[in-house]
Design a protein with these regions (language model features):
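N-terminal glycine-/serine-/threonine-rich beta1-alpha1-beta2 phosphate-ribose binding loop
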Residues: 1-96, 215
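Conserved active-site and cofactor/substrate-binding residues in soluble primary-metabolism enzymes
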Residues: 10, 14, 18, 71, ...
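General beta-strand structural signal in soluble alpha/beta enzymes
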Residues: 33, 103-104, 133-136, 162-163
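Short gly/pro/ser/thr-enriched loop/turn and capping motifs at secondary-structure boundaries
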Residues: 40-42, 108-112, 140-143, 167-171
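Rossmann-fold NAD(P)-binding glycine/threonine-rich loop
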Residues: 88, 92, 97, 105-131
Length: 286
């Protein structure tokens, strides 16, 4: 029998809990610990914290990250924040513990253009300790970037890449509905965008990944964020959005050439009550 992969779950929020339950189903993975600073979760059994039907698992949730990392995990599944700057200390500690990392941090999905100094620091640390790390997820990490690149593989050359993603956020968890500003007035939404609070994180990273992977000469990456205004009252399990309030985000990322030509166009509409959720990719070339 092959040796099982020893894994630690770093962050036991809604996403981390779902990941932990999925890992529990994998015969090749052994969960040896978890990390979370929340006093309501720390020092408890992971299976009980995530509400697993087969709990307890005999797996401790540590408040002290280093104590968990000292267990010598093969891999740390990391899901604590969207901001690369905020999680640098966490990631570097995992690398120093000689554990590989799979992270849901959106800005880690392709940080080479948007955070070149942080990317270089992580790359150097990973090489020093002989491990690897990757940022991934559904979006960024797949639908609006890697899938675009994969579909382009059947072409000789791509001259322009476009993707449109429409998501009905009413079926998503409450943290996401809050992150996209659902239920705010339009003025509140714009103020929160200006403060950097309201946005889908990772769209510039997706633009950069597509541009570099398809060898498109993108010089400038731009991003616009506008409210998707509700045309009728929409109620979700968690919030109610009145007509005229922000229902979510309408976000566009563009990759422009030196002369201003649009080479990459990624549009995301993520709002509660979306009528026709879909993903559309358009590639121009030959």
């Amino acid at each position: 029998m092959k040796k099982k992969i020893r894994a630690i779950q770093y962050g036991v929020g809604p996403i981390g809990a779902s990941i932990a339950k999925l890992m529990r189903e994998k015969q090749a993975i052994e969960i040896i610990g978890a990390i979370d600073l929340d006093p309501a979760k720390a020092e408890r059994d992971l299976g009980e914290v995530v509400g697993a039907s087969d709990g307890p698992w005999g797996v401790k949730v540590f408040a002290d990250a280093q104590e968990a990392l000292d267990l010598n995990a093969d891999v740390v599944i990391h899901s604590t924040s969207s901001s690369l700057g905020e999680v640098m200390g966490q990631l570097l500690a995992c690398l120093e513990a000689q554990s590989c990392i799979v992270s849901t941090c959106e800005e880690l999905s392709y940080p080479f253009r948007t955070h070149p100094e942080l990317a270089a620091k992580l790359d150097a640390a990973a090489k020093e300790w002989g491990v690897a790390l990757v940022g991934t997820g559904v979006n960024p990490g797949f639908v609006m970037d890697k899938l675009v690149v994969t579909l382009a593989a059947v072409s000789q050359r791509i001259e322009q890449a476009k993707a449109l993603r429409i998501v009905d956020a009413s079926k998503r968890r409450i943290p996401l509905q809050k992150k996209i500003g659902a239920g705010m007035t339009v003025d509140e939404f714009r103020a929160q965008v200006k403060a950097g609070v309201i946005k889908h994180v990772g769209l510039p990273e997706s633009v950069a990944m597509v541009a570099d992977s398809l060898n498109l000469p993108v010089e400038t990456i731009s991003e616009t964020i506008e409210p998707k205004v509700a045309t009728e009252r929409v109620a979700t399990e968690y919030i109610t959005v009145e007509k005229g309030q922000a229902a979510g985000v309408h976000q566009i990322g563009r990759g422009l050439s030196k002369d201003g030509k649009e080479l990459v166009y990624l549009e995301l509409q993520m709002y509660v009550g979306a009528k026709d959720p879909s993903d559309t990719i358009t590639l121009t070339g030959h």
